[in-house]
Curated annotation (Swiss-Prot):
EC number: 4.2.3.7
Family according to the record: Belongs to the terpene synthase family.
EC top class named in words: lyase
Keywords, sorted A to Z: Antibiotic biosynthesis, Lyase, Magnesium, Metal-binding
Domain notes: The Asp-Asp-Xaa-Xaa-Asp/Glu (DDXXD/E) motif is important for the catalytic activity, presumably through binding to Mg(2+).
Protein name, as recorded: Pentalenene synthase
Keyword Transmembrane helix: no
SUPFAM superfamilies named among the record's database cross-references: Terpenoid synthases
Quaternary structure and partners: Monomer.
Reaction catalysed by this enzyme: (2E,6E)-farnesyl diphosphate = pentalenene + diphosphate
Biological or metabolic pathway of the protein: Sesquiterpene biosynthesis; pentalenene biosynthesis; pentalenene from farnesyl diphosphate: step 1/1; Antibiotic biosynthesis; pentalenolactone biosynthesis
Motif (DDXXD motif): 80-84
Length: 337
C-alpha cells in the first residue's frame, strides 16, 4: 500500500513499440538543457520511469514524436519537484517562477530565464510545430490554467489552510495534475486534431473531466506515502479523513469506488460519440480524428496512468526524503542576472 491498491480499469493497456529505444535515450534531452547535471539527479530521475509513462500515454508514437512525449514527462516532474519545498509554500516565489515559465507561450525567453523555463520553451516550440493556430491557442490556455494552479496550491500552504472538502480540492487539483496538456500532446504526437467545434461539446468535456479526475485520484493514492513523509496535507485520502472522520482504509476504499463509478460513466459517454458526430455533422476525416482522440488520447491517459503508477519508483517515501527539505536535488528555477 498504496501503489499496490487495485483499481478496475476497463480499458486495454498499450505501449509504444519504440519504448526500449526511448527509454535508453531519455536522459539526453534534460542533460542537454542543464535540467539534469549530476549522477545523483540522473539516477533519481530514472527511478521515476518517465519514458515508460510516455510510451503508455502515447502508444501510437515512435521516433521523434515519442521523444517529445518522454521529454514532456521528464519536464513535468522536474518542474513539479521544484515546489515540494519552501518555494511551494511561498505564493510570491511560486508565481515568479510560473510566470517565467509561462512567458514561453508568448515568445522567446530572455537568456536570464531559469533552466526549467528554457526546457518548457523547447517543449512548446516542438509541440506547436505543424499544429493549427486554433489548436495552439487551446493548448496554451490549458497550460496557463496548469501554471495558475500552482499558485493556488502555494496560497493554501502559505496560510496553512489545507482544503476542507473534496470538492474544494478537486477544483484546484484538476489544474495542477497536468492531464489536459498531456492529452493535447497526443494530438501532436499522432499528427491529428480533434475537430475544434466538438472539443467543448458536453460529451467530450465530460469524458475529459473523468480522465482528469481518475488521474488525480490514482496519483493521490500512489503518492500518499511520499506526501505523508513530506508533511503534505493536500491529498484526497487526507482530505476525506478530515472531512468525514474516516480511517485511511475507508478513504482509500471510497476512492476506489469513485474511480469505478467514473469509469462506468466514461464508457457510457464513449458510446455517445457516434451521435456527437451526427449532431456536429462531422465528415469521415473528422470522425476518424474523434475516434483517434478517444483511442490514442483519452483512453491511454487513463489506463497508462494506472499502469505506470503501480511500478514507478517516484512514489515511495525514500524517493521523497532523499531530496531533502527542498524536494529536489538541483535548483532549476533560479533566474540568473
Amino acid at each position: 500500500m498504496p501503489q499496490d491498491v487495485d483499481f478496475h480499469i476497463p480499458l486495454p493497456g498499450r505501449q509504444s513499440p519504440d519504448f526500449a529505444r526511448a527509454d535508453a535515450e531519455q536522459l539526453a534531452w534534460p542533460r542537454s538543457l542543464g535540467l539534469i547535471n549530476s549522477e545523483a539527479a540522473a539516477e533519481r530521475h530514472l527511478r521515476g520511469g518517465y519514458a515508460d509513462l510516455a510510451s503508455r500515454f502515447y502508444p501510437h508514437a515512435t521516433g521523434a514524436d515519442l521523444d517529445l512525449g518522454v521529454d514532456l514527462m521528464s519536464w513535468f516532474f522536474l518542474f513539479d519537484d521544484l515546489f515540494d519545498g519552501p518555494r511551494g509554500e511561498n505564493p510570491q516565489e511560486t508565481k515568479q517562477l510560473t510566470d517565467a515559465v509561462a512567458a514561453a507561450l508568448d515568445g522567446p525567453l530572455p537568456d536570464t530565464a531559469p533552466p526549467i523555463a528554457h526546457g518548457f520553451a523547447d517543449i512548446w516550440r516542438r509541440t506547436s510545430e505543424g499544429m493549427t493556430p486554433a489548436w495552439c491557442a487551446r493548448s496554451a490556455r490549458h497550460w496557463r490554467s496548469y501554471f495558475d494552479g500552482y499558485v493556488d496550491e502555494a496560497e493554501s500552504r502559505f496560510w496553512d489552510t489545507p482544503y476542507d472538502s473534496a470538492a474544494q480540492y478537486l477544483a484546484v487539483r484538476r489544474q495542477t495534475i497536468g492531464v489536459q496538456p498531456t492529452v493535447d500532446l497526443a494530438e501532436r504526437a499522432g499528427r491529428f486534431e480533434v475537430p475544434h467545434r466538438v472539443f467543448d461539446s458536453a460529451v467530450l468535456s465530460a469524458m475529459l473531466q473523468i480522465a482528469v479526475d481518475v488521474n488525480l485520484l490514482l496519483n493521490d493514492i500512489a503518492s500518499l506515502e511520499k506526501e505523508e513523509a513530506r508533511g503534505e496535507q493536500n491529498n484526497m485520502v487526507m482530505i476525506l479523513r478530515r472531512e468525514h472522520g474516516w480511517s485511511k482504509d475507508r478513504s482509500v476504499a471510497h476512492i476506489q469506488s469513485e474511480v469505478r463509478v467514473r469509469l462506468e460513466q466514461y464508457l457510457v459517454l464513449e458510446s455517445c460519440l457516434p451521435q456527437v458526430g451526427d449532431i456536429y455533422r462531422l465528415d469521415d476525416a473528422e470522425r476518424e480524428a474523434l475516434e483517434r482522440y478517444r483511442d490514442d488520447a483519452v483512453r491511454t491517459v487513463i489506463r497508462g496512468s494506472y499502469d505506470w503508477h503501480r511500478s514507478s519508483g517516484r512514489y515511495d517515501a525514500e524517493f521523497a526524503l532523499a531530496a531533502g527539505a527542498q524536494g529536489y536535488l538541483e535548483e532549476l528555477g533560479r533566474i540568473t542576472h
